[in-house]
Curated annotation (Swiss-Prot):
This is Large ribosomal subunit protein bL36. InterPro entries: Ribosomal_bL36 (IPR000473), Ribosomal_bL36_sp (IPR035977). Keywords: Ribonucleoprotein, Ribosomal protein. One of its GO terms (cellular component) is ribonucleoprotein complex. One of its GO terms (molecular function) is structural constituent of ribosome. GO terms for biological process: translation. HAMAP family: Ribosomal_bL36 (MF_00251). SUPFAM superfamilies: Ribosomal protein L36. Belongs to the bacterial ribosomal protein bL36 family. It comes from Nitratiruptor sp. (strain SB155-2). Pfam families: Ribosomal_L36.
Length: 37
């Protein structure tokens, strides 16, 4: 899980979703998991 000020899709399979007001990226590749913080 990477915590960054701006989250971006790193590949085609990344999805940007919002959970409880937190922007997250979920992906089949665990290295691409991100959270805005």
């Amino acid at each position: 899980m990477k915590v960054r000020p701006s989250v971006k899709k790193m590949c085609e399979k990344c999805k940007i979703i919002k959970r409880k007001g937190v922007v997250r990226v979920i992906c089949v590749n665990p290295k691409h998991k991100q959270r805005q913080g």
